[in-house]
Amino acid sequence: MISLSLLLMIGVESVRDGYIVDFKNCVYRCVPPCDGLCKKNGGKGGSCSFLIGSGLACWCNALPDNVPIKDPLHKCPKR
């Protein structure tokens, strides 16, 4: 019970994998290299992957919750 209390007081940030996006829900292309972009944003790493409807985009592993990832319910406005 004490460990649960400590865990709640300290707080735990969860992580998730996904296509990293900007504030408009638009994916980042594979230049600059995805691994560096993902690490700069707190992820463990990343790679270039194909996303239907967007083309080549950066897929990140273990991004913190505060970094946005692609929401399939919202489209990226045309640039």
UniProtKB/Swiss-Prot annotation:
Compartment(s) where it occurs, according to its Swiss-Prot or TrEMBL record: Secreted
Q: Per its UniProt entry, which superkingdom is the organism in?
A: Eukaryota
Q: Which cysteines are joined by disulfide bonds?
A: C26-C76, C30-C48, C34-C58, C38-C60
Q: Where is it made, tissue-wise?
A: Expressed by the venom gland.
List each copy of the LCN-type CS-alpha/beta domain by range.
18-77
Gene Ontology terms describing biological process: defense response
- Keyword hit for Secreted: yes
Q: What is its main location?
A: secreted
Query: Under the GO molecular function aspect, what terms does this record hold?
Result: sodium channel inhibitor activity; toxin activity
Instruction: Give the range the annotation lists for the signal sequence.
Output: 1-17
Keywords, alphabetical: Cleavage on pair of basic residues, Disulfide bond, Ion channel impairing toxin, Neurotoxin, Secreted, Signal, Toxin, Voltage-gated sodium channel impairing toxin
Annotated function: Alpha toxins bind voltage-independently at site-3 of sodium channels (Nav) and inhibit the inactivation of the activated channels, thereby blocking neuronal transmission. This protein is weakly toxic against insects (ED(50)>2 ug per 100 mg of blowfly larvae), but is inactive against mammalian sodium channels (rNav1.2a, and rNav1.4).
Family, according to the entry, reads as follows:
Belongs to the long (4 C-C) scorpion toxin superfamily. Sodium channel inhibitor family. Alpha subfamily.
Q: What is this protein called?
A: Anti-insect Ac4
Q: What organism is recorded for this protein? A: Androctonus crassicauda (Arabian fat-tailed scorpion)
* Source species taxonomy: Eukaryota, Metazoa, Ecdysozoa, Arthropoda, Chelicerata
